[in-house]
């Protein structure tokens, strides 16, 4: 009986992702193949799933969209692509997804997603207000004879 359940779940994984091509696409993007119930989709196109047969912490996941705000994100996914209301549900801060219980609007939450610019030339670098402890050596400029 257990072998039948394993085979049944394997067939569900292949058919649930749209055949072999869809299965490979999900595997290369997420490095994991899971099946679950679609809980909802955010305004950017990210899809959120849940499978209560998995253990806590691995039972909720997101499949990121391939295009966000005009940028191709097929290979360049980032954890900051999840909106705050879905972040609450994804990290088990609440049991109700935003589709059934929408959160209250806050003025500090962005209306449109801004990409994480860390480790890029656009990153924020604060101005240093303290003096350097170590100064680089500048050789004296004496003309050669």
Curated annotation (Swiss-Prot):
GO terms for biological process: aerobic respiration; mitochondrial ATP synthesis coupled electron transport; proton motive force-driven mitochondrial ATP synthesis. Disulfide bonds: none annotated. It is found in: Mitochondrion inner membrane. Keywords: Acetylation, Electron transport, Membrane, Mitochondrion, Mitochondrion inner membrane, Respiratory chain, Transport. Its main location: mitochondrion. GO terms for cellular component: mitochondrial inner membrane; mitochondrion; respiratory chain complex I. It is a peripheral membrane protein. The modification N-acetylmethionine is found at residue 1. It holds the Pfam family NDUFA12. Accessory subunit of the mitochondrial membrane respiratory chain NADH dehydrogenase (Complex I), that is believed not to be involved in catalysis. Complex I functions in the transfer of electrons from NADH to the respiratory chain. The immediate electron acceptor for the enzyme is believed to be ubiquinone. Complex I is composed of 45 different subunits. Belongs to the complex I NDUFA12 subunit family. This is NADH dehydrogenase [ubiquinone] 1 alpha subcomplex subunit 12.
